[in-house]
């Protein structure tokens, strides 16, 4: 009888605790991750950077035809392709969606974060800086400021820019 009561208690506790550990976000959102669309000048150059330097993986791609792009308000009738990258191939991982319209940017390249408005940088938390720094060196990517530098006892900080000038903060242990 005692074992039955303990089992029943555990079953009830797990049933009521399960929603607290759910992967579904509360409120109005269907996913807890954010998908970010980034327009780049040269898709192949950006894919090379994000896959080989940053270490993202390509998970899928799709096209948006001219009429559909206009209908959705995404462009004034320009067709485009989107390549989805993630830090890991997981449904829960945030999506980094790259697309190109084959045009040069209409604004100068930023040298520092406050040089423009809008999204200016992303922060990626890494398990170890060593493989990231090796890839940065291998692909001749310039680190900005006096980086890598220590943030605190346990974490280093590196700042780089992608081929279009978007800033990427990398934070993690040495």
Say what each PLM segment does.
Residues 20-45, 60-62, 68, 119-122, ...:
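N-terminal beta-strand motif that seeds the catalytic metal site of vicinal oxygen chelate
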Residues 33-35, 53, 80-82, 119-121, ...:
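Extracellular structured ligand-interaction cores
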Residues 1-5:
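Positively charged n-region of N-terminal signal peptides that target proteins for export
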Residues 39-93, 151:
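Core segments of cupin and vicinal oxygen chelate
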Residues 85-90, 160-163, 173:
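Active-site beta-strand termini and strand-to-loop segments that position acidic
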Residues 40-44, 59-60, 92-93, 99-167:
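Vicinal oxygen chelate
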Residues 7-17:
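Bacterial N-terminal signal peptides
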Residues 28-30, 74-79, 113-116:
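A generic structural micro-feature
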């Amino acid at each position: 009888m005692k074992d039955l009561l303990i089992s029943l208690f555990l079953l009830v506790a797990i049933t009521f605790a399960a929603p607290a550990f759910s992967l579904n976000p509360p409120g109005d959102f269907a996913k807890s991750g954010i998908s970010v669309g980034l327009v780049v000048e040269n898709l192949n150059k950006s894919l090379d950077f994000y896959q080989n330097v940053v270490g993202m993986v390509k998970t899928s791609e799709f096209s948006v035809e001219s009429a559909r792009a206009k209908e959705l308000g995404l462009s004034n009738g320009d067709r485009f392709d989107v390549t989805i990258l993630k830090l890991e191939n997981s449904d829960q991982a945030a999506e980094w969606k790259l697309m190109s319209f084959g045009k040069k940017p209409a604004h100068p390249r930023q040298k520092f974060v406050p040089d423009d408005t809008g999204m200016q940088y992303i922060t990626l938390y890494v398990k170890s800086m060593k493989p990231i720094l090796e890839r940065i060196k291998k692909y001749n990517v310039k680190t900005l400021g006096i980086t890598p530098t220590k943030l605190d006892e346990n974490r280093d900080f590196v700042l780089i820019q992608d081929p279009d000038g978007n800033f990427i903060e990398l934070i993690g242990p040495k």
